[in-house]
């Protein structure tokens, strides 16, 4: 049974995950097996659950609790579900929530080198990348570079 909690106090430490911790603090570099990530839409939350990620809590617009989020909340089990009106959430997070729903989850264990490299023809090592958007940009640039090299 989910624990639906209406947000009235933004100072609650339980909301730090969503409002006050940096990406680096969520990642927990010193103990990566205890790292956390934020899934930022119903589709991403569902995919993370399908992949076996373990939810910690959810933050969403109040209107989604009995509608769009009902099945996701059921799948998450007995976790806190923080809910508030749209304007209240915007004040808390400082930005417009993607599809009105966030879910804090434990990061899955990192795979070993052997598992990553098994069957790979090429491997790119990207160090100190904090924003996944940068990985996409690097991948696109690499693809264009390969195409250009083949045309010569």
Predicted regions and their residues:
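Short, aromatic/basic amphipathic alpha-helical patches
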Residues: 67-78
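Boundary-proximal intrinsically disordered activation/regulatory segments immediately upstream
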Residues: 1-61
């Amino acid at each position: 049974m989910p624990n639906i909690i209406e947000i009235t106090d933004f100072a609650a430490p339980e909301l730090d995950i969503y409002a006050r911790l940096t990406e680096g603090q969520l990642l927990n570099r010193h103990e990566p097996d205890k790292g956390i990530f934020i899934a930022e839409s119903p589709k991403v939350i569902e995919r993370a659950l399908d992949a076996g990620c373990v939810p910690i809590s959810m933050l969403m617009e109040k209107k989604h609790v009995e509608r769009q989020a009902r099945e996701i909340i059921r799948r998450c089990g007995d976790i806190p579900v923080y809910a508030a009106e749209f304007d209240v959430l915007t004040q808390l997070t400082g930005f417009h929530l993607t599809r009105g729903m966030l879910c804090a989850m434990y990061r899955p264990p990192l795979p070993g080198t052997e598992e990553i490299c098994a069957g790979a023809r090429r491997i790119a090592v990207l160090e100190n990348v904090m924003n996944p958007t940068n990985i996409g940009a690097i991948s696109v640039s690499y693809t264009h570079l390969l195409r250009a090299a083949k045309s010569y």
